[in-house]
Curated annotation (Swiss-Prot):
Organism: Chlamydomonas reinhardtii
Entry-linked SUPFAM superfamilies: EF-Tu/eEF-1alpha/eIF2-gamma C-terminal domain, P-loop containing nucleoside triphosphate hydrolases, Translation proteins
UniProt entry keywords in alphabetical sequence: Chloroplast, Elongation factor, GTP-binding, Hydrolase, Magnesium, Metal-binding, Nucleotide-binding, Plastid, Protein biosynthesis
Chain intervals for the UniProt region annotation (G3): 81-84
Gene that produces this protein: tufA
InterPro entries: EF-Tu_GTP-bd, EF-Tu_GTPase, EFTu-like_2, EFTU_2, G_TR_CS, P-loop_NTPase, Small_GTP-bd, T_Tr_GTP-bd_dom
Family recorded in the similarity comment: Belongs to the TRAFAC class translation factor GTPase superfamily. Classic translation factor GTPase family. EF-Tu/EF-1A subfamily.
Main location per the UniProt record: plastid
Region G4: start-end pairs: 136-139
Protein name: Elongation factor Tu, chloroplastic
Catalytic reaction annotation: GTP + H2O = GDP + phosphate + H(+)
Listed Pfam families: GTP_EFTU, GTP_EFTU_D2, GTP_EFTU_D3
Any GO molecular function: GTPase activity
Residues the entry annotates as binding Mg(2+): 26
UniProt-listed Enzyme Commission number(s): 3.6.5.3
Amino acid sequence: MSRAKFERKKPHVNIGTIGHVDHGKTTLTAAITMTLAAAGGSVGKKYDEIDSAPEEKARGITINTAHVEYETEKRHYAHVDCPGHADYVKNMITGAAQMDGAILVVSGADGPMPQTKEHILLAKQVGVPNVVVFLNKEDQVDDKELLELVELEVRETLDKYEFPGDEIPVVPGSALLALEALIENPKTQRGENKWVDKIYQLMDNVDSYIPTPQRETDKPFLLAVEDVLSITGRGTVATGRVERGALRISDNVEIVGLRPTQTAVVTGLEMFKKTLDETLAGDNVGVLLRGVQKKDIERGMVIAKPGTITPHTKFEAQVYVLTKEEGGRHSAFMIGYQPQFYVRTTDVTGKVVGFNHIQMRNPSSVAEEHSNKMAMPGDRISMTVELINPIAIEKGMRFAIREGGRTVGAGVVTNIVQ
């Protein structure tokens, strides 16, 4: 059996379901695949096929995530659903599954709950740009006014975390009743069942409200240097993977991080021992540079389009601290902790200079007392970090925290201080 070819006929968008435990994220994911399967746009997946999510490793952390794919008339989607709350936190912070938009699932019977708020906050901080709401379990709410109150509360919560609460589409429905109708008759089409129609209505909103993302190739060029070689008579070659953008021969570039920024000219590009005229996002390339010595470049610097990235030493970040079971620390750490911050291709020593907020793994009144003074394994924290050397950092960038070569945390930059 040969592999099916991935055909790029429609724009591709990455989305995911977020929301409080038991509000119906996985049921909705199953209902979407079954609905669109009836329209010929996906392979239907039942609840238990999605719920038994396989483990993945991202930045040294094990995460359970289920990936499904489906198509609407307009787009091709890759959809991620995580079974456990901790998996969401880890997924969003490590960027294991990047989301261009999210479907926030809120039970109409319960309204926004603590994890609803935490997921919205996380989505905001890790840069999920757009959200569409599915107000689930509509069949369990007898009073229409009650449902309207829940919708209002959801919109206010979104506003509070700086999403446009008034504009965001909110679609009421019942994922379970839609799923049951589709299991009974897998060929149910649009217009044949009230609950299945709500799923179509939700996907119409996802199609129209969540914009197609800008492709990595259209962004300004950036390559993280992995290795540096010197070719006698030709110059210096830096190798690495192109993170974004495109680069051509004779382009000017800046070499940023660890030392004062330098400029150079690209005189050649090589991949798989062949020369190229242009390199694109995702390529592993060797860039031949004129105007710099081998000693001037080292692993951990980046080569970028001039003026697009600057070196920094101090930033704020959202961090997930690994538990002992995940191979992390066995004990808490305080302000003043000095681990290595692994950014792109290198470790840089840094110091935790402040905790801004700690979402504890096991909140209790006693724990609240010392909450902003120490971080325990399993906590999610917002912290301020100061590095000993300036490196190219930008908002939304992911990193790992390491100690003696092992990963003890994962983070995402939420704000640059200096």
